[in-house]
Design a protein with these regions (language model features):
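Secreted/extracellular ectodomain signature
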Residues: 20-114
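C-terminal segment of classical bacterial N-terminal signal peptides
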Residues: 14-19
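Sec-dependent N-terminal signal peptides
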Residues: 4-13
Length: 114
């Protein structure tokens, strides 16, 4: 009985080690354009051709129109840099304010097209 149990455990471990895969998130985080007033972080997933642009600045200085313009300009440049020809938005943009750090974040979710 002990041999059968040991054999069963070894088989289970062998099957598990063969089928187990690492679950890494394929994000590449690029922090670009750090300025005195704002910064932009880009999380790009090449496998899915998706990008998330995160614009952040001080809450007192935040203007949504400026955020849209800056993110759109950076998005156009990023699209050309990566060899894509167009893009579309995956979902509506999100604006969040962190009152503890007095920062406002503007999120834009994009699907890049070839």
């Amino acid at each position: 009985m002990k041999k059968f149990f040991l054999f069963f455990v070894i088989i289970i471990l062998a099957v598990y080690s063969i089928t187990a895969e690492e679950s890494e998130v394929p994000f590449t985080v690029l922090i670009t354009e750090p300025s005195d007033n704002y910064s932009i972080a880009i999380e790009y997933t090449e496998m899915l051709s998706e990008a998330r642009f995160i614009y952040s600045c001080d809450s007192k200085l935040f203007d949504e129109i400026d955020a849209i313009k800056i993110v759109r300009d950076r998005l156009i440049n990023f699209t050309k840099e990566k060899g894509y020809y167009s893009y579309s938005y995956l979902r509506p943009t999100i604006t969040k304010t962190d009152y503890a750090t007095h920062k406002t974040y503007f999120y834009s979710f994009v699907l890049l097209k070839q």
